[in-house]
Amino acid sequence: KGFVDGRSLRLPTVTVRPGKPNKAASSFASGIIREPLSGVEAVCPVDVSTRMWLVSPRTIIGSLIAGYEAPASAFPPSHSVNVPGISVTVREMVDALRRVAGDAVADRVVFRHDPAIDRIVRTWPRDFDAKVGHALGMRTDAGFEAIVRQYVEHDMPR
C-alpha cells in the first residue's frame, strides 16, 4: 500500500574494524590486520585461498548514507540492494598487510584451520552484482591495501 518505504542493504563484511576480537565467524577478517599491527599474533582459521567480499568502515558509512538519501524510485521492486565491496582472498589480505607494514608484522598472522569457522565462511557469497548500489552513489574501496592504510591512518590506536 506504500505506507512504508522499506529498504534492504546487503552489506559486505566490514573490515578492518577497530576494537577487540569477538566470537563472530568474520572476526578474523579484521583480526589478521588489526592484531599484527598492534604487535600481537593473530590466528586465521581459514585457508589463504578463501575469498571474501569486503568493505572498509569509512566506505560502508558512505554507502549507508547513500542508501538512506536515495529516492525510493531509485530502488528496484524488491527494495533490496547489494552494497559494493571488493572480492579478495585471505592471501591478498596478508600480502597487503605485508606491503603496508613489512614482513615482521605480516608474519604475526598464523594459520590454524578451524573447521567450524571455515564451514560458515565458505557459505558466504564471494562477490555480488552491485550495479544498483553504484547507481545510488555507493562507492568501492580502491583495494585491500587502501583499506589497511585507511585503518593505520585513521583508526589504529596510537
Tell where the protein language model's regions lie, with residue ranges.
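C-terminal capping/gating helix-and-loop segments adjacent to ligand/active sites or protein-protein/ligand interfaces
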Residues: 119-120, 125
